[in-house]
UniProtKB/Swiss-Prot annotation:
Together with LptE, is involved in the assembly of lipopolysaccharide (LPS) at the surface of the outer membrane. It is found in: Cell outer membrane. It comes from Haemophilus influenzae (strain 86-028NP). The gene is lptD. Component of the lipopolysaccharide transport and assembly complex. Interacts with LptE and LptA. This is LPS-assembly protein LptD. One of its GO terms (cellular component) is cell outer membrane.
Length: 782
């Protein structure tokens, strides 16, 4: 078998021959856990009376009583069954001490723990007790074991020569033997001294001290490690260490050793306060020993900060900041804080104030790009001040007024690039008329912009016009309607047709004097403008360019429409949208012929979604250039999703080279040709608690696989193990244009389960999210 098809074949076979998935694993595991029968008594249980039944009783009031044969003792939530119980009372009548002595075996139950043992002593007033040769099992959650001696207290239990496991009866996959175990009931954790970790009864690990959670509360300590191997990292091992600093603060520190790179320190701090929540993370490798960088003494690092807060009722603060040491960081390291396929790291901060009819904000925004070809990076917008205002229902409800205004300074790391202040005001008036047949929106708008530009300080920096004033009016008429009918050939279905017609006019202004000409190939136009990627919904946008530096002329009519099919329950099952722009005159931004619409109409754009059934979903989009009779862009996805975690998805995507260069710049496609990829993603839960994920993407133009992944996870009630094998396209320094470089890696994760209430996940979602091309669900009409 051809090697590149091996992973995909395994994924298909797994799906075809899998048995019906078992019920939810968490529910299965709870079926083997004892449950408390009856209603839980709250309050001070110790103050409740004690009820005793037995075959025989010898009572010597008020000091003692002996019960023999089928003794049944109850107090609140406590229930004791035994063959012999002696109850003694001492002290005075106001503060009596009541003790129960159990001999020749007992069965004790309450709402937290069940115990079987030989002999026991109970203080019926304080609930303290001492048990010998006992077996115990938690109520309502996994956890059981044995102990030579158990001392019970109100909030904790002390066990001597004890064992603990979260495995159910009949499963001895793992257990911990310890000279002493202390289980803290309210805090929900256990301390163990001289702990020996055993797998199927065989000791494999010893530690003088160990902590394990026995509930849902977060606890400081070691988390589950992971290990693996890859071409770039060599053998690697990562050990997370968790510190529960406070209920609203925690820190996870993860040292990671890579045999080919060295030690990497990773940390993540999470916080939740009255004025906001967020996450601060860092990754640091002091010296990268990988062969490509060994002579550079290169430090590799990442910093990440995400923060969201609301304060003083009307104020909002948002920060999303990621910075890495170099452009190749996400190529060389797997990180949850970014991917190489993103193309850039976002660095953004914004503080805003909101009122019902206006808001203003102060922000700073820049990008760190990863493209090796680009020597001049994008502009940073620091500072940027925005003010928005609206007033509706003017002129007796006929008019609505909106105002967007902005002042922003643009700067660049390159001394060849000019800097600028941009001042912009954008008032608009619109009148919206609607009835049951549709709506008509008439809008007029004015773009008034002033630039104060300064030549770059570099030796060969180009001259720029110091002051540029640009005023562009806009007029738009937008007509929409909704028509419906019952379908004769599809009984119990209703079809709607929603025609959409828009006329847009904006006069031409030559804007070549805004910004530099050096950044057009890779960074768009001006300071923050670039062509917007096209789809059906973009046909009705006001502008072809993002940002404000390029506002193209427009004299165009857009015709489009959407048809929808609804079933008898009113659920949308299918839709299809199609449209095209007809240019009455060329749309231009300057005198360069390359920057105008070359034809009298845009490409046809189509979007469609089909919920074939509750298990099958299909989505597709397509753009066809009628003037070249060629496809500009196409993608489709078909997904079978019978259950929550079971899915098979087949997808295809195509983008021609002309579309890429026009919309994304020449640097977006290193191979200078069309992108044509087919992919298959399989995620399936199969019998005996196995889960498998297979992912394969093939570039049909390059005739090379882009990414291959096979992940297998075994899940039981008390442990899980996963293995992931991955092969994906990467790159290295000084790589030639036609060279394809792959990174092969294997990752292994072991996990103890049953220690919390929500740790029985199949692992499919985690495996689907791994990789350069993570799974994206086919859009459905749910």
């Amino acid at each position: 078998m051809n090697k590149k098809h091996t992973l995909i074949s395994l994924a298909i076979l797994t799906a075809l021959y899998s048995q019906q998935s078992l019920a939810d694993l968490h529910e299965q595991c709870l079926m083997g856990v004892p449950k408390f029968s009856g209603e839980v008594v709250t309050g001070d249980v110790n103050s409740l009376p004690v009820y005793i039944e037995a075959d025989n009783a010898e009572i010597n009031q008020p000091n003692d009583a002996t019960y023999q044969g089928n003794v049944d003792l109850k107090q609140g939530n406590r229930h004791l069954l035994a063959q012999s119980v002696q109850v003694k009372q001492s002290g005075n009548q106001s503060t009596p001490l009541r003790m129960a002595y159990v001999r020749n075996g007992f069965d004790y139950k309450d709402n937290q723990i069940n115990m079987l043992g030989k002999d026991a002593e109970f203080n019926l007033d304080s609930h303290d007790g001492n048990l010998t040769n006992s077996e115990y099992e938690f109520v309502g959650r996994q956890g059981r074991g044995k102990a030579d001696n158990i001392t019970l207290h109100n909030n904790y239990r002390v066990m001597k020569n004890a064992t603990f496991t979260s495995c159910l009866h009949g499963d001895n996959a793992w257990a911990v033997d310890a000279s002493e175990i202390r289980q803290y009931v309210k805090e929900e954790y256990a301390e163990m001294w001289h702990a020996r970790f055993k797998i199927h009864g065989v000791p494999v690990f010893y530690t003088p001290y160990l902590q394990l959670p026995i509930g849902d509360r977060r606890r400081s300590g070691l988390l589950i490690p992971s290990a693996g191997t890859s071409n770039r990292d060599g053998l690697w091992y990562a050990q997370p260490i968790y510190w529960n600093i406070a209920p609203n603060y925690d820190l996870t520190f993860t040292p990671k050793y890579m045999s080919r790179r060295g030690w990497q320190a990773n940390g993540e701090f999470r916080y939740l306060t009255s004025i906001g929540e967020g996450k601060v993370a860092g990754e640091y490798l002091g010296k990268d020993r990988y062969s490509e960088y060994a002579s550079d003494n290169r430090k590799r690092h990442l910093f990440y900060w995400n923060h969201n807060s609301s304060f003083l009722q009307n104020w909002r603060l948002n920060i999303n900041y990621t910075r890495v040491s170099d452009k190749r960081y996400f190529n060389d390291f797997d990180s949850i804080y970014g991917r190489s396929t993103d193309g850039y790291a976002n660095q953004y901060a914004r503080i805003a104030y909101y009122q019902p009819n206006y808001n203003f904000s102060l922000s700073a925004h820049q990008f760190q790009i990863f493209d090796d070809i680009v020597n001049i990076g994008p502009y940073r917008a620091v500072p940027q001040l925005d003010f928005n205002y609206h007033k509706y229902d003017l002129a007796n409800g006929w008019l609505n007024f909106k105002l967007h205004s902005q002042a922003v300074r643009f700067d660049n790391d390159s001394k060849l690039m000019p800097t600028a202040w941009r001042f912009h005001a954008e008032p608009s008036l619109n009148s919206l008329m609607s009835n049951k047949y549709g709506s008509l929106n008439i809008e007029t708008k004015l773009y008034a912009t002033r630039y104060e530009q300064k030549k770059g300080s570099g030796k060969n920096a180009e001259d720029v016009q110091k002051t540029v004033n640009r005023v562009i009016p806009q007029f738009k008429v937008d007509l929409q309607s909704v028509l419906s009918r019952d379908i004769t050939f599809l009984k119990e279905y209703t079809q709607t047709f929603e025609p959409h017609v828009q006329y847009l006019y904006r006069p031409y202004r030559n804007q070549s004097n805004i910004g530099s000409t050096l950044n057009n190939d890779y960074l768009g136009f001006g300071y923050d403008s670039a062509l917007v990627q096209q789809d059906y919904y973009s046909l009705f946008r006001d502008r072809r360019y993002s940002g404000l530096d390029r506002i193209s002329s427009a004299n165009q009519v857009t015709l489009g429409g959407t048809t929808r099919f609804y079933d008898i329950a009113g659920e949308e099952r299918f839709n299809l949208s199609a449209g095209q722009i007809y240019y009455l005159s060329n749309s231009r931004i300057d005198e360069n012929p390359a920057n105008k619409t070359p034809t009298s109409s845009s490409a046809w754009a189509l979007e469609s979604n089909w919920k074939i059934s509750n298990k099958w979903y299909w989505r597709g989009s397509y753009q066809f250039d009628t003037h070249t009779n060629s496809t500009s862009l196409a993608n489709t996805s078909l997904e079978y999703n019978p259950e929550k975690n079971n899915l098979i998805q087949l997808n295809y995507r195509y983008v021609n080279q002309e579309y890429i260069d026009q919309n994304l710049g020449k640097s977006a496609n290193a191979y200078q040709q069309d992108i044509q990829q087919v992919g298959l993603v399989v995620g399936w839960e199969i019998a005996n608690n196995w889960a498998v994920v297979g992912r394969y993407y093939q570039d049909l133009a390059l005739q090379k696989p882009v990414e291959q992944y096979l992940g297998v996870q075994y899940n039981s009630c008390c442990w899980a193990a996963s293995v992931g094998v991955k092969r994906n396209v990467t790159n290295h320094q000084n790589q030639t244009r036609n060279e394809i470089v792959y990174d092969n890696s294997i990752g292994i994760t072991l996990e103890l389960r049953g220690l919390g209430s929500n740790d029985h996940q199949s692992g499919i979602q985690e495996m689907l999210e791994k990789g350069k091309l993570p799974y994206i669900r086919a859009f459905s009409l749910d």
